[in-house]
Amino acid sequence: LIEGHSHLLLHPYNETSWDNQVLREPEALRVARAVNHARATLQAGFTTVRDLGTEGAGYSDVGLKQAIEQGIIPGPRMVVTTRAIVATGSYAPKGFDPRWEIPQGAEEADGIEGLTRVVRDQIKRGADWIKVYADYRWGPNGEPQPTFTETELRTIVEVAASSGRAVVAHASTAEGMRRATIAGVVSIE
């Protein structure tokens, strides 16, 4: 079996909220949980997972993948995306005093140059796929709205493709899906 959309570095929100996992849990604790999640996933019969973002845990998915590949811990084969790419200001955590820089659950980038740099950096750090949020809940009343232009999404796809990587997009709106499809995204979640 293949799990096509996992987040091994998260645990259920009824245990701890997403904000608390990103802002309060040490990365080492999140990795320790991920080791258990990887083992349980394999024991459930999944031999491969596509892990679609560390949600604030940096590049820990790359190390988890390496530990499994080297036989240090049991787990399924992993295809990793490292840090999802989001438009500046569009993702979470939100609602904090604007004077403070708050750790983000994904990597913010904008424009052709910024997106090119971020995609290449993620590839350098071990991303097998690139994940982008084509839309998110950042409208005036928190409703989902597209986050990137078609040109920006096309840039992400072109840079990823130049190194043989595919792009997966989070999209829940018709316009976000349309833009992602036109840009050449391989998978929409």
Question: Where do the model's predicted regions map?
Answer:
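Glycine-rich, aromatic-flanked loop segments that form ligand/cofactor-binding clefts
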Residues: 1-5, 66-92
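Metal-associated gating/positioning segment near the N- to mid-region
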Residues: 1-70, 151, 175, 182-183
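Conserved, mostly hydrophobic/aromatic
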Residues: 2, 45, 78, 122, ...
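Active-site gating loops and adjacent loop-to-helix segments of metal-dependent hydrolytic enzymes
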Residues: 8-29, 88-104, 138-146, 181
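Short, acidic/polar
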Residues: 30-40, 108-123, 171-177
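Divalent metal-dependent hydrolysis catalytic cores, especially in the metallo-beta-lactamase
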Residues: 33-59, 75-84, 127-138, 166, ...
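Active-site core of metal-dependent hydrolases
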Residues: 88, 132-189
